[in-house]
Regions:
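Conserved N-terminal entry element of GNAT/NAT acetyltransferase domains
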Residues: 1-25
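A conserved beta-strand-loop-helix scaffold within acyl/acetyltransferase catalytic domains
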Residues: 16-17, 24-94
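Short loop segments at secondary-structure junctions
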Residues: 65-66, 98-99, 169-173
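Conserved active-site alpha-helix within GNAT-family acetyltransferase domains
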Residues: 118-123, 128-155
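Short coil/turn motifs at secondary-structure junctions
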Residues: 77-79, 98, 131
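Conserved acetyl-CoA-binding loop-helix of GNAT-fold acetyltransferases
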Residues: 95, 101-114
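C-terminal "cap" of GNAT-fold acetyltransferases
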Residues: 149-173
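A short, internal acetyl-CoA/4′-phosphopantetheine-binding micro-motif in the GNAT/acyltransferase core
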Residues: 90-101, 129
Length: 173
């Protein structure tokens, strides 16, 4: 793992509604590189194609010489809480293996976190297997009980598959 900062890195936000097939292909390639499990590949392809219908999703892409090396998606998604409705979800955060440790993930996530506070982007709520990374950027773990309103058969089932659910900013109460 190289420690330092990736050179010639270009970070851009693209509205999902206008993502080209070429860029989407790069996103799918990076998702599969990050999560290579066979069963998960098929599920990820389906989810990626299904997400194409979501006109309010944005993709933050980190490029080096026209190669996608980092990615995150975010979208306004309403979540009802005891204190009212909050909105924003972060998903599909990944960095290609040889660029890990070079500030690519940090730059992508800082770009997304900078959007918090904009209309319909109250907080960033997400799941992760690497909570320490996000804690350094101002997020914290939450232990709230979640009810999955889209799962009519078992709404009490945990809607998250990763162990840690986090929220940004860490001051959100």
């Amino acid at each position: 793992m190289k420690i330092g900062e990736a050179k010639n890195l270009k970070v851009q936000c693209i509205a999902h509604a206008v993502v080209s097939d070429e860029v989407l292909g790069e996103v799918v390639r990076l998702l599969h590189e990050t999560w290579p499990e066979i069963e998960y590949k098929q599920q990820r392809i389906f989810q990626t194609i299904k997400a194409m219908e979501d006109r309010q999703k944005y993709r933050v892409c980190a490029w080096q010489n026209q190669r996608l090396v980092g990615h995150a998606a975010f979208l306004p998604r309403s979540i009802d809480t005891n204190r009212g409705r909050i909105s924003m979800q972060l998903a599909a955060v990944c960095v290609t293996l040889e660029f890990r440790g070079q500030q690519v993930g940090r730059r992508v996530i800082e770009w997304v976190f900078d959007q918090v506070g904009q209309p319909r982007l109250d907080v960033a709520l997400f799941q992760t297997g690497v909570p320490g990374f996000y804690e350094k950027l101002g997020a914290r773990c939450v232990s709230n009980r979640f009810v999955n309103s889209t799962n009519t058969e078992a709404p009490e089932a945990n809607p998250w598959w990763d162990e840690h659910v986090m929220i940004f900013p860490d001051t959100y109460d």
